[in-house]
Amino acid sequence: MEHGKSSALPQGLLVGLVGLAGALGLGVVLPINLRNADSQTNQNLDIKSSAATTATQQRIEKLKASMLKTWQQEAKAKGLSYVVPPSLQGVVINQATLSPSQKIIALTFDDGPWKDTTVQVLDILKQNNIKGTFFVVGRNLKLYPQLAQRVVTEGHAIGNHTWNHFYHYMNPQAAAFEINSTNDLIYQVTGVKTTLFRPPGGMMHNGLVAYAKNQKYSVVMWSSDSIDYNRPAVPRLVGNVMKFARPGGIVLMHDGGGNRTNTVKALPQIINNFKKQGYRFVTIPELLEMQGKNQKVIATKKPK
């Protein structure tokens, strides 16, 4: 009996060891397989997530394109093309010739759209229920198209201020690029066709104005310069504007092109000063329309 007992122990031990080894082997294999399965699942999820993101981006782009198309159609339907009287096409305009009793003034803003300042200017104009005119730079419009859309949707006028805001002399081809590229983008972004042009720096003899006049643009200058590009103190800036204010006047300010903090601070005071003097605010197209009507009245009064 002792012999049988002693020979049975090793077999039991052997069975136990085999079982333990099997269990250990299974324990080693299972985590590896599970990890592989998890990795495969994560890869599948990543692929699905990436595909979903791409699909979402495509839907967003389609929606944006659809919204832009709808906006352009609505803009055209609303007649957002500034019809300038024939007598004021292809000419330089510093101000409208109105009677002293016609207390009308046009606020204009150059060099935008600008990330922060344009928004602040638009907010101030909206608070005061005033419409202005914005002469945009093409390369800035490309960066902030949504600001130009806001300009137009809130009832302001928009004009061309070239693509690069260069001052140097340009041949007709270069001038055409500067003006046409900007006008094309204005139309693409807002649906507006504008024939309002303002030369950078008021430069009259570097090729831009000659091209613009040849293309029947109204070259819109100004009669009252804020000189805000020199960043004067707010009281001086306000004084610069009011000094030459007159009925039919055009005020030059800037919403872009640099630090326009003082312009934003001065704008409410400028508006209040004009209101106290009985002025009403109009856009450049409205001002030119009034000028055109006045010219017709004068013409009909001339002796035959």
Task: Mark where each language-model region is.
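Active-site/ligand-binding-proximal alpha/beta "capping" segment
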Residues: 211, 270-271
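Conserved nucleotide-state-sensing and coupling region of NTP-binding domains
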Residues: 274
